[in-house]
């Protein structure tokens, strides 16, 4: 019987099987940020186990509230900073070098096909775009990962999603994943790996694949995952060129992780994306989705462009194409948070930041801030935000606030009109 990519990764990293259905895996990368990691650090210190299993395999960043907004967040940042210095963790990104973790770490080439990756953050599934098994974990698992370099997981069952056809004009990876979540439901992939396949995925950039995998958790998925291919090789080549004689040789190695033709899936869902319209959410769950045609005209107070879902250069380019030479509506405020310093710098050099500022956007430093209602764009009670983030839970971006999830293109069109708008008219 053949194996899925997730099963192959599990088999290659298996350390122990303490009881049926549970696998203890060796970890390739443990990622840390200043919100969840300090809790693990404090407990390790209290237990007299302030150690790390391998400093080269730990990556840490201050990203959620940066710069710190108050004493509490400053203390959290200091705990992570002091810990990283104490253990000589070289891949630690402090103020000035920091960015949103799930954009920054791939940008640094830290994730490779076949890797096992954990973090105390639910959107760690983003890194599955590289053909890795990447999952968010709780504090106890994070502690064990930091200390021992292992983590326990349930035996993986995989749901395969075949995205067939071709993305229409004005429709992007964000629309595709919202459509998938709408079909699966918020619990439809609980404790499952979602394997994204098909012509649509094959044609996507790594940035778009990261958008897909980023929101696997919104359907309950432990991880999202894509097959590593020539697109993956091209993205990683600056970091792996010394390890392989050629890109072709790297691709041969990467293909060893591909799911076998006779792999067994718990479920296979075929979706033709060719006729898909831009998609937006309408309620307080990510599976509550409608087309922009159904939602057009809904007024908003704020537009937010950024996050680990859609704060990459590709996303900024899409939005800037629509915004160029235009102004945002006087009834809205618009905020752009580039996901990393490199994204910010590249956008500056391409003239994209000028386009956003001339349109009326406020441009912030790289941060998660507004996405989870912590800083740099928090909503007031009763306000509505058109957002490129990944969660629309009640109060997610501010107590009593309403969030509608959408693509960067739809958010840009919405900013221009001050109400939900179809981006296709501007393309």
Curated annotation (Swiss-Prot):
<dbReference type="InterPro" id="IPR011826">
    <property type="entry name" value="HAcnase/IPMdehydase_lsu_prok"/>
</dbReference>
<comment type="subunit">
    <text>Heterodimer of LeuC and LeuD.</text>
</comment>
<keyword id="KW-0004">4Fe-4S</keyword>
<comment type="function">
    <text>Catalyzes the isomerization between 2-isopropylmalate and 3-isopropylmalate, via the formation of 2-isopropylmaleate.</text>
</comment>
<keyword id="KW-0100">Branched-chain amino acid biosynthesis</keyword>
<keyword id="KW-0408">Iron</keyword>
<dbReference type="InterPro" id="IPR001030">
    <property type="entry name" value="Acoase/IPM_deHydtase_lsu_aba"/>
</dbReference>
<dbReference type="InterPro" id="IPR015931">
    <property type="entry name" value="Acnase/IPM_dHydase_lsu_aba_1/3"/>
</dbReference>
<keyword id="KW-0456">Lyase</keyword>
<comment type="similarity">
    <text>Belongs to the aconitase/IPM isomerase family. LeuC type 2 subfamily.</text>
</comment>
<keyword id="KW-0028">Amino-acid biosynthesis</keyword>
<keyword id="KW-0479">Metal-binding</keyword>
<feature type="binding site">
    <location>
        <position position="308"/>
    </location>
    <ligand>
        <name>[4Fe-4S] cluster</name>
    </ligand>
</feature>
<dbReference type="InterPro" id="IPR018136">
    <property type="entry name" value="Aconitase_4Fe-4S_BS"/>
</dbReference>
<dbReference type="GO" id="GO:0051539">
    <property type="term" value="F:4 iron, 4 sulfur cluster binding"/>
</dbReference>
<dbReference type="GO" id="GO:0003861">
    <property type="term" value="F:3-isopropylmalate dehydratase activity"/>
</dbReference>
<keyword id="KW-0411">Iron-sulfur</keyword>
<dbReference type="InterPro" id="IPR036008">
    <property type="entry name" value="Aconitase_4Fe-4S_dom"/>
</dbReference>
<dbReference type="InterPro" id="IPR006251">
    <property type="entry name" value="Homoacnase/IPMdehydase_lsu"/>
</dbReference>
<protein>
    <recommendedName>
        <fullName>3-isopropylmalate dehydratase large subunit</fullName>
        <ecNumber>4.2.1.33</ecNumber>
    </recommendedName>
</protein>
<dbReference type="InterPro" id="IPR050067">
    <property type="entry name" value="IPM_dehydratase_rel_enz"/>
</dbReference>
<dbReference type="GO" id="GO:0009098">
    <property type="term" value="P:L-leucine biosynthetic process"/>
</dbReference>
<comment type="pathway">
    <text>Amino-acid biosynthesis; L-leucine biosynthesis; L-leucine from 3-methyl-2-oxobutanoate: step 2/4.</text>
</comment>
<keyword id="KW-0432">Leucine biosynthesis</keyword>
<dbReference type="GO" id="GO:0046872">
    <property type="term" value="F:metal ion binding"/>
</dbReference>
<dbReference type="InterPro" id="IPR033941">
    <property type="entry name" value="IPMI_cat"/>
</dbReference>
<feature type="binding site">
    <location>
        <position position="371"/>
    </location>
    <ligand>
        <name>[4Fe-4S] cluster</name>
    </ligand>
</feature>
<dbReference type="Pfam" id="PF00330">
    <property type="entry name" value="Aconitase"/>
</dbReference>
<feature type="binding site">
    <location>
        <position position="368"/>
    </location>
    <ligand>
        <name>[4Fe-4S] cluster</name>
    </ligand>
</feature>
């Amino acid at each position: 019987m053949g194996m899925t990519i997730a099963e192959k990764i599990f088999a290659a990293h298996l350390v122990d099987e303490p009881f049926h259905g549970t696998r203890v895996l060796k970890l390739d990368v443990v990622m840390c940020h200043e919100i969840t990691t300090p809790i693990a650090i404090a407990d390790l210190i209290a237990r007299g186990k302030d150690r790390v299993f391998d400093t080269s395999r730990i990556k840490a960043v201050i990203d959620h509230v940066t710069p710190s907004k108050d004493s509490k967040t400053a203390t959290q940042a200091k705990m992570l900073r002091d810990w990283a210095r104490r253990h000589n963790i070289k891949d630690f990104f402090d103020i000035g070098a920091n960015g949103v973790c799930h954009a920054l770490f791939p940008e640094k080439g830290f994730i490779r096909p076949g890797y096992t990756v954990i973090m105390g953050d639910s959107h760690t599934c983003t890194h599955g775009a590289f053909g890795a098994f990447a999952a968010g974990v709780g504090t106890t698992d994070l502690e064990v990962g930091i200390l021992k370099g292992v983590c326990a997981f349930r035996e993986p069952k995989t749901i395969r999603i075949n995205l067939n056809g071709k993305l229409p004009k004005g429709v992007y990876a964000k629309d595709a994943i919202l459509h998938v979540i709408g079909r699966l439901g918020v619990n439809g992939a609980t404790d499952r790996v979602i394997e994204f396949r098909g012509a649509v995925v094959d044609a996507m950039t790594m940035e778009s694949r990261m958008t897909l995998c980023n929101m696997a958790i919104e359907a309950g998925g432990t991880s999202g995952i894509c097959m590593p291919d020539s697109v993956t090789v091209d993205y990683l080549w600056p970091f792996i060129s010394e390890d392989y004689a050629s890109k072709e040789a790297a691709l041969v190695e990467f293909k060893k992780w591909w799911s076998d033709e006779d792999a067994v899936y718990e479920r296979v869902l075929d979706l033709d994306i060719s006729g898909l319209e831009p998609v937006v959410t309408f309620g307080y769950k990510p599976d509550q989705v409608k087309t922009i045609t159904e939602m057009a005209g809904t007024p908003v107070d704020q537009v937010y462009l950024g996050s680990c879902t859609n704060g990459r250069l590709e996303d900024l380019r899409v939005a800037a194409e629509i915004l160029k030479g235009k102004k945002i509506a006087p009834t809205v405020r618009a905020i752009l948070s580039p996901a990393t310093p490199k994204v910010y710098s590249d956008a500056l050099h391409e003239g994209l930041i000028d386009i956003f500022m001339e349109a009326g956007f406020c441009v912030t430093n790289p941060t998660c801030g507004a996405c989870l209602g912590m800083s740099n764009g928090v909503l007031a009670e009763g306000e509505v935000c058109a957002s490129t983030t990944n969660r629309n839970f009640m109060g997610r971006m501010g107590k009593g606030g309403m969030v509608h999830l959408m693509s960067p293109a739809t958010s840009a069109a919405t900013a221009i009109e001050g109400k939900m708008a179809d981006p296709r008219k501007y393309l």
